[in-house]
Curated annotation (Swiss-Prot):
Name the UniProt record assigns to this protein: Succinate--CoA ligase [ADP-forming] subunit beta
Family that this chain belongs to: Belongs to the succinate/malate CoA ligase beta subunit family.
Source species taxonomy: Bacteria, Pseudomonadati, Pseudomonadota, Gammaproteobacteria, Cellvibrionales
Domain ATP-grasp positions: 9-244
Enzyme Commission no: 6.2.1.5
Keywords attached to this entry: ATP-binding, Ligase, Magnesium, Metal-binding, Nucleotide-binding, Tricarboxylic acid cycle
Binding site for ATP: 46, 53-55, 99, 102, 107
Organism: Saccharophagus degradans (strain 2-40 / ATCC 43961 / DSM 17024)
Top-level EC class: ligase
Signal sequence segment: none
Length: 388
């Protein structure tokens, strides 16, 4: 789950990190009034969406009057911001962050992520702040400094000092950097984060370090023990179908094809999409119904898949281990009848009671095509999607 910038900065402030004074406004009037509360004669206004590239898209602006703030808010509130990280429709803007202006002498990058290869939290820092870190990693990987955090000891001050020296910071700045580094490391563990970024972490004209941005993502598997963070969830920033799927504990990702896929198991789901592609088809989605593929979940999965008007056929690929294939077949039949599926449905069942499941499908009298193998299923569904 992602947080908005203003929410991330609220967390930063709780952990003693230096952030700008800011107010998230929901109306143009609130945005203009925020300038009086913040004070000063220059402000930065930022459209709040879960996407990078806002500056290039016009979603961030330096202003020097309340009239400019109000004009910016009127332009974006209620509208969609399109950046290189969004789809063609963009993401809706429901809040504008108004912040005090910070004079910048230099820009750095600081971030942390769970690294699967080392099975550790890894911090990354770079002198190339304010730009896309992916681009830096690709073109000049030597400019990215790393510190791997041992889960037994946690982040250590010496690691922060080592990064600070390599970033070219002076002694006072290294002390500030150490406090930021340790604060972020504690927050990462306390809040069950999957990723955090400060891009840029700036050096002000006075020579102090300041967190100018905040990107925070929480591990969705840990949301049950982070109720306060769960309240910060903004469903408007998610694909409507993906949000619906999450309510039913279905893993769904929308794609651009015309063949709907319903599979139990993430690995099998990816393999299914690969073989559909191999035989000339285009998957419309990734959908993992998991181990508990009950009739109710299959019904909801059908509803989600068929809410995409591009879907011309559906492939169901189930490996029966704990789940019996005959029960899955009954669930599929019930779902097809309840939802009123109008497109061809190809089903491949393998494993526990697979033959019985195939018989249940054959005896149903519905337009359900039982495949003999995964290859056969892919060939059949591609033909069905093409109307052959």
């Amino acid at each position: 789950m992602n947080l908005h910038e203003y929410q991330g900065k609220q967390l930063f402030a709780e952990y003693g990190l230096p952030v700008s004074k800011g107010i998230a406004a929901e109306t143009p009037a609130e945005a203009a009034a925020a300038a009086d509360i913040i004070g000063g004669d220059k402000w930065v206004v930022k459209a709040q969406v879960h996407a990078g590239g806002r500056g290039k898209a016009g979603g961030v602006k330096l202003v020097s009057s309340k009239a400019e703030i109000e004009e910016f808010a009127k332009k974006w509130l209620g509208n969609n911001l399109i950046t290189y990280q969004t789809d063609e429709n963009g993401q809706p803007v429901s809040r504008i962050l108004v912040e005090s202006c910070t004079d910048i002498a230099d820009e750095l990058y600081l971030g942390a992520v769970v690294d699967r290869s080392t099975r550790r939290v890894i911090f990354m820092a770079s002198t190339e702040g304010g730009v896309e870190i992916e681009k830096v990693a690709e073109e000049t990987p030597e400019k990215i400094l790393k510190a791997i955090i041992d889960p037994l000891t946690g982040a250590q001050p010496y690691q922060a000092r080592e990064l600070g020296f390599k970033l070219g910071l002076n002694p006072v700045q290294i002390k500030q950097f150490t406090q930021i580094f340790l604060g972020l490391a504690k927050m990462f563990v306390d809040k069950d984060l999957a990723l955090l970024e400060i891009n840029p972490l700036v050096i002000t004209d006075e020579g102090n370090l300041h967190c100018l941005d905040a990107k925070v993502a929480i591990d969705g598997n840990a949301m049950y023990r982070q109720p306060a963070l769960k309240e910060m969830h903004d469903p408007s920033q998610e694909d409507e179908r993906e949000a619906h799927a999450a309510k039913w504990e279905l893993n769904y990702v929308a794609l651009d094809g015309n063949i709907g896929c319903m599979v139990n198991g993430a690995g099998l789901a990816m393999g299914t999409m690969d073989i559909v592609k191999l035989h000339g088809g285009q998957p419309a989605n990734f959908l993992d119904v998991g181990g508990g593929a009950t009739k109710e979940r299959v019904v909801e999965a059908f509803k989600i898949i068929l809410s995409d008007d591009n879907v011309k056929a559906v492939l169901i690929n189930i490996f029966g281990g704990i789940v019996r294939c005959d029960l899955i077949a009954e669930g599929v039949i019930g779902a097809v009848e309840e939802v009123g599926v109008k497109v061809p449905v190809v089903v491949r069942l393998e494993g526990n009671n697979a033959e019985l499941g195939a018989k249940v499908l054959a005896d149903s009298g519905l337009n359900i095509i039982a495949a003999e193998s995964l290859t056969d299923a892919a060939v059949q569904v591609v033909k069905a999607a093409e109307g052959k």
